[in-house]
Amino acid sequence: VSLSSPTLYPLVSCEGALTDGNLVAMGCLARDFLPSSVTFSWSFKNNSEISSRTVRTFPVVKRGDKYMATSQVLVPSKDVLQGTEEYLVCKVQHSNSNRDLRVSFPVDSELPPNVSVFIPPRDSFSGSGTRKSRLICQATGFSPKQISVSWLRDGQKVESGVLTKPVEAETKGAGPATFSISSMLTITESDWLSQSLYTCRVDHRGIFFDKNVSMSSECSTTPSPGIQVFPIAPSFADTFLSKSARLICLVTDLTTYGSLNISWASHNGKALDTHMNITESHPNATFSAMGEASVCAEDWESGEQFTCTVTHADLPFPLKHTISKSREVAKHPPAVYVLPPAREQLVLRESATVTCLVKGFSPADVFVQWQQRGQPLSSDKYVTSAPAPEPQAPGLYFTHSTLTVTEEDWNSGETFTCVVGHEALPHMVTERTVDKSTGKPTLYNVSLIMSDTASTCY
């Protein structure tokens, strides 16, 4: 009897629009195999197995002198809408050979993105030394969810200072499932005032959607696209140092603020104490506002969801946005290196620059602080770059921080410590210390000074 390996075909549901209440049926057809014994299993793209409780395998059917069989898996549509998976893997074991087949999630409809870029108000630039602010690019209403966002300055791609959030499913009633994504670019005030042209480039299914802005855009008479809401997640530095998580809900393009209300609530609907702050009017005659609330760091780290609700007389219904700590980003701890001042700089007897290089970490949220003789230094004593993607390691980031001290302090043997905080580190924080006598960095136990600022959250 000759053996015949199975040929695999994908099967997808022909039902209507995806909603959070539906199960998406996906299947795998194996045909023309011999002998008749065959085994199906399913996994996600990241190789994690799918529970057999959601898998149904139908009896083998004889077709001519060979056999065929099918397997079905039911996946909650919210996983399809909100997850990062693009396909499932159907795995078929047969005595003649094992075969794998990618079964792509169904695309409810193909819709292009609506791209908007929000420019910074003139009074939003802040910081000691180099003053900075952010451009925000938002793409909404698109499907399918696969999309990428990049930034250009005067036609050249910008690599540093970019923070792009994961794609989110848009919450709405009946109709096709659509998605949104936002990306932020940190810019300096000098670059903005120099009339540099910034471009947010959105790539969706091989088609580019470009939106250009510059300082002259502030004087544009283009009408407002309507009230926009941007929930901003707390940074790791905030949650680690204060033991509380600060939730920010940014509302832009307000024509009036008298009827505005911003509120935060936990996943069970319990209202959180929300402080609302109204900015001054912008050059395009609109306002911005922020609603801030604080929750325990433990609640945020556990993945609990929090919802910002915005009401205003210009809105036909309240706008709601829900955020939670992302669980889909792979965690990788940073490697930390401290470099002493260059000999050529010390010869000048003017100043000494100590550099802290932080490499290979994920997610991108990290903080760097400096200490002298174990005491924290003020942030105006050092400059830390925004995390940037590692050129040779996709998914990982690097940053560097430079501390400038007097040549006298360095030559007198003062110790300088780079303290790095990241959620993937065993104790959330690590440090490296260097001084003139060693000439090389030394690893010490984590200082307790930083924890003195932490408060207990009840």
From Swiss-Prot:
Pfam families: C1-set, ig
Record's keyword annotation contains Protein biosynthesis: no
Record region (CH1): 1-106
Keywords of this entry: Disulfide bond, Glycoprotein, Immunoglobulin domain, Secreted
CH3: region residues: 223-327
Main location: secreted
Glycosylation sites: N46, N114, N212, N261, N277, N284, N445
Protein name in UniProt: Ig mu chain C region secreted form
